[in-house]
Amino acid sequence: MTEALRSCVHTHTTFCDGASTPEETVRAALALGFVSLGFSGHGAAAYDDAAMRPEAEVQYRREILRLRAAYAGQLELLLGQEHDALSPYADYPYDYLIESVHYLRHQGDLLCVDLSRADTEAHIRRFGDPYAYCRAYFETCAAAYEKSPANIAGHLDLVSKFNGAGDLFDEADPRYLGPAREALAVAVERGLAVEVNTGAMARGYRPIPYPAPALLRTLRELGGRVILTSDCHDAARLTYGYAEALALLRAEGFRTALVLRAGGFRETAL
């Protein structure tokens, strides 16, 4: 089995919006024969109910470091954070960061892009055009990648979460693909690994991972690197969709993926 299937560094626990404790997630990883497991709690953001509060972040860091010591020699544990592009960066050191866009600024308001279909429809009405909305999202991604110290670009086409039926916008339209590809190009230029994220599959929103096949093709053409994650919010689904994601990567011509270990990224054959 490829090592890419025995690691996940995008996980959420009871310290933010996850259902499982960190130790429950560790035990699930051990049962699956994992080589590494990363915790990526949502970094503090006053506008985001899913984010860790400052006091919770202190407790989160303490607990992950405790588990790292307790399970030393059994599993490599990494202390990470998922950073939202509109929030400040943490004062604490982390082993790695995932850079994600969950919110857009528009006319003085913050709009959450992954809350619900009804909210997405309302956002599109505010922008007056679905492609203007998508362009604003991808431009926010590109700007974030340009300045971010992160290692990983999170769920790059999250804006498509509620477009499973393709009725909100056409993901093959150049007005969608153009800005998406520009964001991908910035991620690759800045050296970020692009996660292939099965989280929306686990929660029933999409039949395929982020990013969509057309964007994976662009990523391969650009020479970008991928890392497989499940965006896990429930330890029971730690590798949900991994087999399908692996098949998709192979079909799109990827021969290797990255695995994040204690010493940094390693490239592994698919």
Tell where the protein language model's regions lie, with residue ranges:
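Residue-level marker for buried hydrophobic side chains located in beta-strands
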Residues: 7, 38, 152, 226-228
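Extended substrate/RNA-proximal surfaces in nucleic-acid metabolism proteins
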Residues: 51-189
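Glycoside hydrolase catalytic-domain groove-lining segments
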Residues: 164, 170, 174, 181-197, ...
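An N-terminally biased module of ancient metal coordination in phosphate/nucleic-acid-related enzymes
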Residues: 1-85, 91, 95, 160-162, ...
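Long, positively charged, glycine-interspersed low-complexity recognition regions
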Residues: 208, 212-217, 221-270
